[in-house]
Regions:
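...captures the hydrophobic TM-helix bundle architecture rather than a specific catalytic motif
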Residues: 1-571, 575-623
């Protein structure tokens, strides 16, 4: 029975690959493929669920495919099935089927018709990988696919300014959550000394002994998991990204931010509940986060002027209550609540255009202005203050910008001297010297070895920060990113005798190929358009869709999406950072936090936004 679990991944994967066979004009075939794939998945899950119930609800766990294995670490795909998986899988299949049926007509004659359905199928693949995942590595694969499809769907109207800006804002916070999940996985490797599966979390004796032995490490792991879950589910104080993420088509907003993806933070807490529920501190923290979110989001939702923002904050408030329910151990109630909220928000978003049209028409015949009186009471002043604060969304967006991103931008601006030609040559030479030092590592004194690995890791971090703040030359920014990743790998290799050439090759091979493809695309743009600066959005996807596609693939390979060996390389790289190496961990984590934002920013600035050549109709900047 458990051997059937991988087929729930194969079905959407095959559907996504088949979508490339059609061009944008084949609307009937494209939508038919999507409906057929999701419909087949829904029927398969339903039949499997009946058989699973007849077998008296066995918990299924299967180790499917081993990516990498040596004496100390094993990286493998694992799939897991229980009642939580069943609820999320059925919910996802039903809602995705409804949305693709609706989108068949809603997206009719849209310029990106094929692109929309291909992205939806990729999203559905990532969603299924996440909910069927049996360990953190498998979950992280689905988590990454969801983050990338989020960026693509928000920026679906890629010739407009606001969708691109909001896509970058959303993916920035998503990346912060990804790094938190990565750090939880890193510490989990060091405390369990194996690739722990979710099935093993059900063994109370093993988990209790593990917590007693590694209490401080467990605090770190669960804190990272809570932050990752809070970001994915837009909980306080990370709530501001969700309404901004609804810049894409209404149908993608319904499935992504109204019903499925936004609830995966709840899924993560449920899946790891057996690991953290015995520590009361975490239950209290989750309850406080959920309660604060429910209160603040409710106040914000009641005063917003746009229907999508109202629905977004209403959903955030309900998910806050789900966090409380999960922390209290009321999982059945939380799952019922989750399904009700998902169906309601999907319905609200899908009918919102027609409802708004009716209300706009109706107000001409039945408009009654509200009468305001003069009130000077203390209660009215408090009410007005809360109203004003809620209109500003409690300054959550501004606070996130000031706390998370402005310090990194400021530091990057102070490092602009690293972008001179002389500096690039010096860093390239130092990198070659470091490679030579790695080759003759046995002859290097241990004291110098410890200094060099920290120095190289710090240089890698500074280079990627400089690229992140670059506003002048896209090619130089790309070169800085390439150098930063090479320094990152070398920093780990210099310290660890067991980090060999083969392990370096896993990460370097994917990055090197992506670097060459990206460099070629930027060079072709510069040759045709004379300059590739980052001071504005150029919208070159209108003229060079092929280059835009290949450059996007290069960006995805750079950030380690699972279609390249870089994904395995990142896992191996982090596994060789020891628990006591706090400085090295900090430099590496910041590097991986910023690199995705930096490469996607280059992609967005060069290829997305308003086309610089006004030889055809273009959208207003405010659209």
């Amino acid at each position: 029975m458990k051997e059937l679990l991988p087929y729930f991944i194969y079905i959407p994967l095959i559907g996504f690959l088949l979508s490339f066979l059609f061009n944008n004009k084949n609307e009937k075939q494209i939508s038919g493929l999507a409906i057929g794939v999701v419909g087949l998945q829904a029927i398969s899950i339903f039949v499997f669920a009946i058989y699973w119930v007849m077998q008296k609800f066995p918990v299924l766990d299967v180790k499917h495919f081993v990516f990498y294995k040596d004496v100390e670490i094993e990286i493998f795909l694992s799939f897991y099935f229980d009642a939580i998986t069943l609820v999320f899988a059925l919910l996802g299949a039903i809602l995705t089927l409804l949305v693709v049926l609706f989108s068949k007509y809603y997206m009719h004659r849209e310029e990106g018709y094929k692109r929309f359905f291909s992205t939806i199928l990729l999203f559905y693949l990532g969603y299924n990988i996440t909910v069927f995942s049996g360990n953190f590595e498998t979950l992280f694969i689905g988590w990454e696919f969801l983050g990338m499809t989020s960026f693509l769907l928000i920026a679906f109207y890629r010739d407009r300014y606001l969708p691109i800006k909001n896509a970058l804002k959303t993916v920035s916070l998503y990346r912060f959550g990804d790094v938190c999940l990565m750090l939880a996985l890193w510490m989990s490797h060091h405390t369990w000394h194996q690739n722990i599966t979710f099935m093993q979390f059900n063994n109370t004796d093993i988990v209790s002994a593990h917590i007693a032995e590694h209490y401080t490490d467990v605090l770190f792991i669960v804190t990272m998991l809570i932050v990752a879950a809070a970001i994915k589910s837009a909980q306080f104080p990370f709530s501001s990204w969700l309404p901004r993420a609804m810049e894409g088509p209404t149908t993608s907003s319904a499935i992504f931010y109204g019903s499925l993806s936004v609830h995966l933070g709840v899924f993560l807490l449920m899946r790891t509940y057996a690991y953290w529920h015995s520590i009361p501190l975490f239950s209290i923290i989750i309850i406080m986060v959920g309660a604060a979110t429910a209160i603040v989001a409710t106040l914000i939702a009641r005063v917003q002027s746009t229907v999508k923002t109202q629905i977004a904050y209403s959903s955030i408030a309900q998910i806050g209550l789900m966090f409380i329910e999960v922390a209290m151990g009321w999982h059945v109630f939380a799952l019922i609540h989750l399904c009700g909220n998902a169906f309601l928000r999907t319905y609200q978003l899908l009918v919102s255009p027609s409802v708004l049209g009716y209300l706009i028409h109706d107000q001409f015949f039945s408009y009654h202005p509200k009468q305001y009186g003069t009130q000077n009471s203390f209660a009215s002043k408090v009410t007005n203050s809360i109203y004003l604060l809620s209109i500003k969304e409690w300054n959550l967006n501004t606070t996130m910008k000031k706390v998370l991103w402005n310090p990194l931008k400021w530091l990057g601006k102070q490092l602009q001297f690293l972008q001179t030609n002389i500096a690039l040559i010096i860093f390239a030479v130092v990198l070659l010297m470091g490679a030579v030092a790695f080759y003759f590592e046995n002859n290097i004194p241990p004291q110098l070895d410890h200094v060099l690995h920290l120095l190289f890791s710090c240089i890698g971090m500074l280079l990627v920060l400089s690229a992140f703040a670059n506003r002048k030359n896209a090619i130089k920014a790309w070169l800085l990113i390439i150098l930063s990743q090479m320094y990152n790998v070398l920093a780990i290799a210099l310290l660890n005798d067991d980090y060999g050439f083969a392990e370096m090759l896993y990460y370097s091979a994917g990055v090197f190929l992506a670097a060459l493809i990206g460099l070629y695309c930027l060079w072709q743009i510069k040759k045709s358009e004379s300059h590739v600066s980052l001071d504005r959005f150029y919208g070159y996807v209108y003229e060079y869709p092929g280059l835009a596609f290949w450059f996007l693939l290069a960006c995805l390979a750079f950030i380690g999406l699972p279609f390249t060996p870089s994904f395995i390389g990142i896992d191996l790289l982090f596994s060789h950072i020891h628990k006591h190496e706090y400085a090295l961990l900090t430099f590496t984590a910041i590097n991986f936090l910023v690199v995705e934002i930096a490469v996607l920013r280059i992609y967005a600035r060069i290829f997305l936004g308003q086309h610089i050549k006004q030889t055809h109709p273009i959208a207003y900047k405010s659209s």
